[in-house]
């Protein structure tokens, strides 16, 4: 252990350092002194000579001596800071030059020791240290010294609270330093120093950046980082790692060949150009800009006002556009949240300038002005009501502009305003004026505005009816349906059906006033929910099969179709005429029509089976089939232009006994199945026709690759009950007696487009062949006459056996081997017998068919379906994700993305087994508590995202209700109670309110009316007690509670267990209604009146008025209730 340092040792060290002794000897002496300093206190008499000796060593030229001396000096400073800080404070001015000089040393070790020495000296002499750093290190010429001094400044500020205001001018100069690394360090230092500074300091920093003319790139980075503190700290996304894992794989995009074929079924309007892409009227997103003080916000608006004075010129138009963009950036930033009222007042003061920008002839300036108004409407909603009148006048006028961009932007802006602001009758008057405009554009846009208003006010019909808006809506619809422009009429038909869903009686009256042609067009509109043509399927279209040889084929054009038809006609002329005897024969192989060469790419051919070839339709001809799914009258048969070839099949199948001479085989040899000639099978096969031009009446059929389940027809060879795609290798079908063959006098097969499939099938246009054995048909349920009349008459033609491999519509699509490539690997038989020789069909099939699986026609799947078991790994993953989601729901920390992952787990058909009763109850209880939680009780979710989280909670509850309806039944009352409590936090104009009301209406049909009435009565009594303290929130809960109780009373009339209130329940409901009739809120009073009307209709006149009398309702509310009761009785009598 080293001994304590002595005066003689220090004197010897000082003497040897002044001589020419070797460097090693000097370094050894200094090391010995350093060891003593580290272990023992230093005598006071040694302070001064020891500092002198270490100064000499630290400033020497040899690096070994410098290393030993400077490290010893650092230890000496640390020792004296604890032993004698007063002496160290006196010695600091002499030692600081050496330390500051080492801040710029080439070696990083010495620079780090210098920072430590400065930190030690700052504790005893802060003024001297700050002066040396600020006036020497930071303004010197050494870039390393500048960097280290800024590091020391930041470290000292974070650890010891150093006030850095005096360093700001120096930092501003360092931001423009010639050295790039110095600029980067200065930028980082400024950001870290001002990150947690008050708003006034940040505002001063922005002014300093402007005053020192810091380059814009650096200024923007600093301001952006200061305005977004979350970007500089690590986010908490790792907490959601459990729920961020993918649950379901994303679906790959459809191939290009399939996407091109999808356009074949889209109807084309005469007033539209479907090939021209529409204008994108959505505003472009902007970078947010943040303000820190009210003074800074006032300065921004004060500078803007001068740009909007006078007329638009070449000098100020760009400043106006930049001002619009800056206002949008402020809205995207914190101006709305931190300076809500003052920012709105400043916008109102600048409204004249905003209108000048909107009406500018410069498209970019007008576009920015429209985007600004949309952002204001989205951010403030009803808060911008005072500005709506002048804005509506401006934008309605702008919609008639000749510039398409300006017109489309004005239309989008009006749509946004109508969807966000409060409803007034003036808005409907603006729409009515637009419907009467001489230009077609405002009339066309008015249909969209009217749809927006109808969608928004669907749940607030009373407000529209009492202000005269309903009459204006009817006038607008009548005017649009009779408009001279076909595009306006087409758009107004869609609006009419939206109106019909809200006021059906009024809509029926409007339709009755139209002429017959207009009524037919209105009923055939695709937006008509009652149109049957939308649920019927069209025929399979080219390219929709799963065969890679078919899917890879390009879509043939109309020109190819014409050429193919001409070739078929020319080839038919060169063939000898067909014998008359061949016309009357019935081919057991399958009757075919004249098929052109272009239709040979049909998917009906397989390796071991073939379907009936579909007829080829001319590009300009009519056919009984096609892409339209609606039943239609068959077109006239075209006259024969040439004699039919001798080997062609008959035109139709006649009711005759099958002859011994069959028709000629197809042109290409196929693999034959050796079967009995007596066996015949019913086959339904979609045709493959040449595409033709779109027709106005063609339906928009869905194009999908999912198998189609068909009710009542099952596979004869497999006992499984789900339907799927047909297998390329089909086993033999069972025998069918000849008596089961039914021939059609007009055609062999009905067009697949005219065969309606069940509504439960997930896809409409699939290649599907159905095999129904005749031996099974007698064992099936005998259809009623009504069912027989609804089923199409399908001709049964003999054909080679084709089998359907059952599968569930929810399973993933299985892609089988291409029949064309699969056929190459199998030995093909050669026809050695004459062409017209009788062929054995389906011989040797099974004699006893397997039992038929039970089929659920309502749900569209088999009752005996057994789901594919999921893998243990998948089950464990889902279970872990579910547990994580439940825990985060209970702690109210689950965000929007987490809820979406949770919904994916619930939707997973293979993940339902992980939902035990305990997990289901825990999840549902947590969701209800999360839903009704006050915003202050959800600290983990930002305030601006809480409404989105609540919307996801509603979506999750609805999904649980849909998937596990019976498990949900005990929680109905609790759910309605949570909805009422959550309703108190949101205004009626909020989009989440409509979701709450829809969920409440669905829960009513599931729960017990008596229990619901008891629970809601207790909740509403609490709301009535809180009315004085929180009037607005209590009124919202009361309004929704009255509505729910009214629905309980009314909906029970249509249920299997009607609800008749007892005397006690009637008194409870009447008492609540009586108290709500005294409310200061008009919506609460109106809902209470509606509840009274429903009670009167339910319990009768005598019981109702007795209950009202017992509750002591005043005369004025009684008169109002009587008025609405009489009004309802009249409406019921009129509808009856």
UniProtKB/Swiss-Prot annotation:
Q: Where in the cell is it found?
A: Nucleus; Cytoplasm, Cytoskeleton, Spindle; Cytoplasm, Cytoskeleton
First-listed, main subcellular location of the protein, grouped into a coarse class: nucleus
Q: Name one GO molecular function term.
A: microtubule binding
Q: How does it assemble?
A: Interacts with microtubules.
Q: Taxonomically, which superkingdom?
A: Eukaryota
Q: Which cysteines are joined by disulfide bonds?
A: none
Which residue ranges traverse the bilayer?
none
Each HEAT repeat occupies one of these ranges, namely 95-133, 167-205
Q: What is this protein called?
A: Protein stu-1
- Bias (Polar residues) occurs at 673-683, 777-793, 822-833
UniProt keywords (A-Z) are:
Cell cycle, Cell division, Cytoplasm, Cytoskeleton, Microtubule, Mitosis, Nucleus, Repeat
Please give the biological process terms from Gene Ontology that the record holds: astral microtubule depolymerization; cell division; mitotic spindle assembly
Q: Which Pfam families match?
A: CLASP_N
Please note every region of biased composition (Low complexity).
Answer: 595-622, 701-716
One GO cellular-component annotation of the UniProt record comes to: mitotic spindle
Gene3D superfamilies (alphabetical): Leucine-rich Repeat Variant
- This protein's species is Neurospora crassa (strain ATCC 24698 / 74-OR23-1A / CBS 708.71 / DSM 1257 / FGSC 987)
